[in-house]
Design a protein with these regions (language model features):
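Bateman/CBS regulatory modules and CBS-like beta-alpha motifs in cytosolic regions of diverse proteins
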Residues: 6, 11-13, 17-21, 31-60, ...
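Histidine- and aromatic-rich ligand-binding microenvironments
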Residues: 10, 25-26, 86-87, 157-159, ...
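Short secondary-structure transition/capping segments
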Residues: 21-24, 35-36, 81-82, 93, ...
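Short, structured interface segments
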Residues: 26-30, 75, 79-94
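A conserved regulatory-domain signal marking ACT and ACT-like small-molecule sensing domains
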Residues: 91, 101-194
Length: 194
């Protein structure tokens, strides 16, 4: 458990899932010769089915503060587990984190939430939305929409959003290329000094 940084361990009897044990309870066991099934530990009966949606898995991790979620088939046979690292990698792929591009965060009214209109604005600038998600806030009528765009140069898209009265809350470009503007600026300054 320590090697993989796991704080929970699924307990199984062949393929039968018995429950989820916490690291704390397992560490309290003094006799290392006793089988885990014979230890006086309380087991969580938490699991997810193999066809569950990722949101269900995220909910279990969040609500129960788990480091792993056991995965069972429809006959409740143990198939494996999802670790927090697996979940993070899957979520990174889901939100196109590793794809090049920029991020635009919009603040909008919850009554004016039209993803199709936002998509039209982005596509009118010859770009595509790679991923999007919406955050809501308690006691607020505002939503925060985060758009991952397949371009790093976002000024035209931002101008279009502002033209349609969208509030641009933040812009993040993960551009690693140099467009040569610093070289041109330095050349211009050298020219002026001559």
């Amino acid at each position: 458990m320590n090697e993989f940084k796991l704080y929970h361990l699924p307990i199984v009897n062949e393929t039968q899932y018995l429950g989820l044990a916490s690291e704390e309870e397992l560490m309290e066991a003094r006799d290392m010769e006793i089988a885990i099934g014979a230890l006086p530990i309380s087991l969580l009966s938490t699991f997810t089915f193999e066809n569950a949606h990722i949101y269900e898995v995220i909910r279990l991790f969040s609500e129960l503060q788990l480091s792993v979620v056991p995965v069972l088939d429809q006959q409740k046979n143990y198939l494996g587990l999802v670790s927090i690292n697996h979940l993070l990698n899957y979520t990174a792929n889901l939100y196109a984190v590793n794809e090049p591009g920029g991020i635009i965060v919009l603040s909008i009214s919850n009554r004016n939430n039209s993803l199709s209109h936002m998509s039209q604005i982005v596509e009118a600038e010859n770009a595509q939305i790679l991923s999007s998600y919406v955050s809501s806030f308690p006691d607020s009528t505002r939503l925060e929409v985060t758009l991952k765009i397949n371009k790093t140069e976002l000024s035209a898209i931002i101008a279009s959003f502002e033209r349609y009265d969208y509030e641009v809350k933040g812009v993040f470009n993960n551009s690693s290329h140099d467009d040569g503007s610093m070289d041109r600026f330095n050349s211009f300054m050298n020219y002026l000094n001559v």
